Structure formats: structure tokens, C-alpha cells
């Protein structure tokens, strides 16, 4: 696959340690840094100095934290590739993760696709795990269920529904609004077991909560953000019920067939499958 087929972007805000781990995993597995666009949302630690040492495809330094939606749009618009991969910076990638992600999307006519995830502490051999997991679950899909830790978006999607809501006060609700618009437009999307990431766990949001004196369980966004979806109470409730039912069904089927699922959490040195 030609690297010009895709462009990768992530936003960062402080927590330079996790950005370094992410970039190091790119280098380790041959993901070209000239296809990576980093948008720094006003970091005050060593993040900016570090980014300036890298041979990136582009780097944008915002004066203040403009939120995910603005940053993701800024990054996606730099190289304007056929596929834009929007991801968190607190992740580790695995061998052939981009190729597996996009090849699976093409084979299944998907326009938005996310990789499978392990979340929590990285207290296991992730590379060894993914060699087995990506082969075992390469043909498995959770249709209609991508996630914002990482998503590859085909260029046709931007033309159909537009980009992310560029509203800083949303504080993390941008992905919900984007997926809602995609579902309304009938855009095919899924999570695949052919590509895997390790996700340390919403490090940027945790940093912003700490600065604002919020508890971990508290949300950053406004409690009435759901109004932006223009959904009735009943529609929201039915959609949530369907999602819970689907997640339960996927978990049951995947455990029965593979002894694992496409979403795991590390807890007490073991995997908890969701």
C-alpha cells in the first residue's frame, strides 16, 4: 500500500510521555512519520520541543486548547488523503495496523473503520498478543460500531456529512455527533479484529479534568450536549438499548468462537473481555 493513500493525525495536550510512546511505536512498526500530522492544543510541558525534533508530515501549534473537533479537522485537511486516520496519542500501534485497517475496509465496502482495542496498563507483551489476535480475529467485524480512539475515514465521508463539529466547548462530544451523522446518512462502518491498538486510556481528557478540578467520573462536556443530536428522549433510549444488546451479542459470539473479544481491558494482570 502506498503511504500516500492515508494520512494520520492526532491532537495532543501535555502528557508528552504518552506522545513519545505512541511515536516510538510508529517507528518500531514502520509507520512513516511523514504521514503523521500532529496538532498541539496549547501544551505547556515539553510536548512542543519534542514535536519539533520529529520529521513529521506536519505540525500545528494552537495558541490554546481548541478541543478535539477543531484539531482533528486541522490535521485531516493538511494532506487530504483518500483515508484520514484520526486517533488518540495515548496508544501503541501494532505491525501492519494501517494496512490491515484499510484493506479490511476496502474488502467490506466500509467507509469508517476502527481497530480492536486493549485498554489499561501495558503489563503484557502487546506485540506477541497482536500476532495471535489479529490472525485469529481477522475476519471479525462489529458492524455499525466504530470508536473514537482510532478511526479511518474515507474521503467520501467528508463530502457526505462534513467534518467534525468545530466547537471547543464540546470537550469530547465531537465523536458522538460525528457517528450520529454517519448513521443517519447510512454510511457503512465497523470495528475490525484484523488490526489492534493498545490504549492507555483517555490521557488528554484526564489531564484536562485535573486542571479543572473534576473527578475522573465527571464529564468534560456540558450535561445537555445531547441536545445537539436533535433526538427525542425515546429515540435516545431506544438507541442506547440497541447498543447494549449488540455489545452483549458480540461479546457472547466472540467469546464462544475465539475465547476473547475485540475489546479487552487489563485488570489485575489479566484480560477482562467486553
Please identify what each model-predicted range represents.
Residues 124-148:
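Short, flexible, basic/aromatic active-site loop/helix in glycosyltransferases
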Residues 1-25:
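N-proximal low-complexity "stem/linker" segments adjacent to membrane-targeting elements
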Residues 84:
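Short aromatic/hydrophobic "clamp" motif used to bind/position activated sugar donors
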